[in-house]
Swiss-Prot record:
The active site is at 146 (nucleophile). One of its GO terms (biological process) is dTMP biosynthetic process. GO terms for molecular function: thymidylate synthase activity. It comes from Agrobacterium fabrum (strain C58 / ATCC 33970) (Agrobacterium tumefaciens (strain C58)). Pfam families: Thymidylat_synt. It catalyses: dUMP + (6R)-5,10-methylene-5,6,7,8-tetrahydrofolate = 7,8-dihydrofolate + dTMP. This is Thymidylate synthase. Belongs to the thymidylate synthase family. Bacterial-type ThyA subfamily. Gene3D superfamilies: Thymidylate synthase/dCMP hydroxymethylase domain. It is found in: Cytoplasm.
């Protein structure tokens, strides 16, 4: 995807070298936006192969409101292992905030269910927002939300999504985030009876870790291939009814994977 390679190049060429929480060091810019027209194909990287199984299972795990890595481990997904405690718990991370945001009066708010209902009954609303950033609980989370708020927008029978990501690990994390929220947009569009529109990805602190510079330079030498097509099982009409087997990625051709260490 040209949009992603442009981001890599922009940060490598114009970014500021800074320290960070992990002690690794980064090169970063503040504020960057990419736009993907989902009618042109599914935005998954072709300049390195991604582990799509991890992306799908993580999204289903979020939507289930789960915050323990047991489901992920059972399905061969290890991306959260570094942050879990000895029992596999992560604290009130994404799934808890999406599906069970605690209200002051003791209620728990299912933001995703409310979102789906609002998209069906009041599509022109400007309040189709889900937030994972709960200041009262951030300190209890194993990792505070990086992709922390998203909003849907309906126009001309199409559903678009914009994500705000406060902290963006460009080499390892952002490719997953693009594919994950593009997939979420396809899923939500199907269950509310709309066509997919755009996925807009807005980044706050957009950074490349110092120990990813060599890998980023390698990736920038590669030429993007045609985007694949993501097929969803058309019989699924409930967002919480999707299973891993309901997704098929067709015509995905990608260059070899590029290994890089994760900063914890």
């Amino acid at each position: 995807m040209k949009q992603y390679l442009d981001l890599l190049r922009h940060v490598m060429e114009t970014g500021s070298d800074r320290g960070d929480r992990t002690g690794t060091g980064t090169r970063s810019v503040f504020g960057y936006q990419m736009r993907f027209d989902l009618s042109e194909g599914f935005p998954v990287l072709t300049t390195k192969k991604l582990h799509l199984r991890s992306i799908i299972h993580e999204l289903l795990w979020f939507l289930n409101g789960d915050t323990n890595i047991a489901y992920l481990k059972e399905n061969g997904v290890s991306i959260w292992d570094e942050w879990a405690d000895e029992n596999g718990d992560l604290g009130p991370v994404y799934g808890a905030q999406w599906r069970s945001w605690p209200a002051p009066d003791g209620r728990h708010i299912d933001q995703i269910a409310l979102l789906i209902e609002a998209l069906k009954t009041n599509p022109n609303s400007r309040r189709h927002i889900v937030s994972a950033w709960n200041p009262a609980l951030v300190d209890e989370m194993a990792l505070p939300p990086c992709h922390c708020l998203f909003q849907f927008y309906v126009s001309d029978g199409k559903l678009s999504c914009q994500l705000y990501q406060r902290s963006a690990d460009i080499f390892l994390g952002v490719p997953f985030n693009i594919a994950s929220y593009a997939l979420l947009t396809l899923m939500v569009a199907q269950v509310v009876g709309l066509k997919p529109g755009d996925f807009v990805h807005t980044l706050g602190d957009a950074h490349i870790y110092a120990n990813h510079f060599e890998q980023a330079q390698l990736q920038m030498t590669r030429t993007p291939k045609a985007l694949p097509t993501m097929r969803l099982n058309p019989d699924v009409k409930n967002l919480f009814g999707f299973k891993f087997e309901d997704f098929t990625l067709e015509n995905y051709e990608a260059d070899s994977s590029i290994k890089a260490p994760i900063a914890v």
